[in-house]
């Protein structure tokens, strides 16, 4: 992959499970927090996570809980959980994000399993069940997935936190579902690749975006949960 080759990027912002793999493969250099004057602004709630328990490599950039959002004007299905996405009445009427890790996770939850099970038999069974969702899926797209819901092209969608926020701003009439099977949770974080050509620039950028007012602007724009405690007072209601 591009990051195994290295040398092209000074800073990478990635999902937690990807970061875990990158660290395991030696693709991430240890973080020198002393070079980030705004480091103490970070919220410890989003630190010391499974992918970086000692905070040796990463700086959190955002967190979120993917959710189902649906248009009650386009379907009579009362959606209360992931399992409802399989309802035949939603044929060709569901949009999904293009993240297999997440979509496989919600399928596992419909089976009463953990998002993070490592049981291969269970994972294979989830894959088989996921195939049965195909008739209901109209689109799989990671970027601006909410647009299909906003426009009325689909009746239901499984969206990232930022997409949920955007959808509700455009269509307050949409319904948000906190699935009865349980919620997923993820964190994005930044790291400096082992072969970063200009680590100084990466540290300068990390310092800049974690200044309170700058961080607030970032979180208001991306629509994820704020991971910078000092920025909270600058975020609008």
Named regions from a protein language model:
Residues 1, 19, 82, 145-148, ...:
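Short, hydrophobic alpha-helical packing/hinge segments within bilobed ligand-binding/sensory domains
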Residues 2-7:
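Short, well-structured alpha-helical segments in soluble
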Residues 8-153:
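Extracytoplasmic ligand-binding site segments that recognize negatively charged/polar headgroups
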Residues 19-21, 150, 156-173:
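A ligand-binding cleft/hinge motif common to bilobed small-molecule-binding domains
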Residues 105-109, 165, 207, 220:
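Generic alpha-helical structural context detector
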Residues 146, 150, 168, 193, ...:
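Generic hydrophobic alpha-helical scaffold/packing signal
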Residues 183, 188, 193-237:
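Mature extracytoplasmic/periplasmic domains
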């Amino acid at each position: 992959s591009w990051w195994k080759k290295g040398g092209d990027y000074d800073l990478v912002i990635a999902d937690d499970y990807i970061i875990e793999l990158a660290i395991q493969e030696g693709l991430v250099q240890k973080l020198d927090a002393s070079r980030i004057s705004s480091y103490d602004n970070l919220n410890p709630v989003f630190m010391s996570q499974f992918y970086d328990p000692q905070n040796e490599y990463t700086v959190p950039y955002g967190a979120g809980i993917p959710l189902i959002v649906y248009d009650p004007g386009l379907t009579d299905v009362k959606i209360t959980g992931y399992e409802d996405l399989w309802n035949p009445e939603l044929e060709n009427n569901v949009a999904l994000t293009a993240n297999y890790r997440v979509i496989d996770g919600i399928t596992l939850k419909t089976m009463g399993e953990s998002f993070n099970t490592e049981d291969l038999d269970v994972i294979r069974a989830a894959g088989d069940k996921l195939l049965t969702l195909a008739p209901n899926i109209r689109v799989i797209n990671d970027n601006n997935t909410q647009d299909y819901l906003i426009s009325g092209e689909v009746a239901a969608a499984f969206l990232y936190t930022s997409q949920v926020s955007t959808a509700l701003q455009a269509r307050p009439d949409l319904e948000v579902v906190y699935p009865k099977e349980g919620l997923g949770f993820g964190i994005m974080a930044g790291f400096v690749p082992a072969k970063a050509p200009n680590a100084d620039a990466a540290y300068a950028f990390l310092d800049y975006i974690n200044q309170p007012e700058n961080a607030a602007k970032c979180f208001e724009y991306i629509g994820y949960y704020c991971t910078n405690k000092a920025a909270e007072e600058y975020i609008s209601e």
